């Protein structure tokens, strides 16, 4: 995925904004990989520049329970797209394109999980805006046929929204819900929105993502 963002998707963005001068050079792709069972993620815009956005449980905006200790790579997708907009020269190559905070995927090439995660938290937190960012991200990524083919290899696609009011299950509830379908796991609210039907994804709101 990182190589796609460095090359293929950069070219796609340029072609999508062909009325503007192309973005030249290598784009920055900020990423971190973890195989921790329990960890948090935090919006990098809320951290000091260069700080890790993968934190100890309870220290961030959303928690992951990665029960198989699978290596997961998280990419700062918002920051990635933002660099294509040259505000000084008004070259807004990604203007009005929804962008979630993170895109993540199984790092050991087993193609188990592909995740888009939007952290719509803080004083300006809005549910509708979060949904827009999720849809805009998966829709724009899959407009590129090469990226679309890559995403469709994954066994599960998760589109996750975390807001200030998202549910957070207790440890006991999490243990009890381990083998439940996603729509029955405590602390998960499934999102029903016809715009997502084409992507074959689990779309839900939660503060704690469970990956068996």
Model-derived features: where do they sit?
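Domain-level recognition of nuclease-like catalytic cores that cleave nucleotide substrates
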Residues: 9-12, 150-212
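Catalytic cores of nucleic-acid endonucleases
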Residues: 124-166
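Short acidic, S/G/P-rich loop/turn micro-motifs used as interaction or catalytic elements
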Residues: 91, 121-125, 166-170
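Charge-rich, low-complexity N-terminal segments
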Residues: 1-79
